[in-house]
Amino acid sequence: MKCKPNQTRTYDPEGFKKRAACLCFRSEREDEVLLVSSSRYPDRWIVPGGGMEPEEEPGGAAVREVFEEAGVKGKLGRLLGNFEQNQDRKHRTYVYVLTVTEILEDWEDSVSIGRKREWFKVEDAIKVLQCHKPVHAEYLQKLKLGGSPTNGNSVAPSPPEGDP
């Protein structure tokens, strides 16, 4: 289990733990996504992400978490949405799209806890995540449905000025 000595959990006014994550893609085609092994269950794959630090912006937290957990750097793209998990834990996760530009050979979690990473086709990643991390599978399903930077909500276009 991953435990950081100086980590402070942050919560929003509704009591949800504030988290940030990235769907890390090999290219802008967004057809291959990088998953990492779970710190609790090393034989299971997850989307890299974690808790936000106090005063940290969601995009900055997402980039930091991906660097720590997956050992990659990249170009932060759009916000895919804000996803809630209510079953076992109250989490609210900002999920971004990131195009990987640099892959480190050794990184923090590979050295400290033996974390692994692997590229998956999006369809295969959904299947792998579906059984034990369904909320992570939802991120990719939303992406496939044309997820846009509207914070997870559909937004109807505004009528032109003067229209009733």
From Swiss-Prot:
UniProt-listed InterPro entries: DDP-like_NUDIX (IPR047198), NUDIX_hydrolase-like_dom_sf (IPR015797), NUDIX_hydrolase_CS (IPR020084), NUDIX_hydrolase_dom (IPR000086)
GO cellular component annotations of the record: cytoplasm; nucleus
Natural source organism: Bos taurus
MF term (GO), any: bis(5'-adenosyl)-pentaphosphatase activity
Residues that hold Mg(2+) 1 according to the record: 49, 69
PROSITE patterns (alphabetical): NUDIX, NUDIX_BOX
Cellular localization per UniProt: Cytoplasm
Entry protein name: Diphosphoinositol polyphosphate phosphohydrolase 3-beta
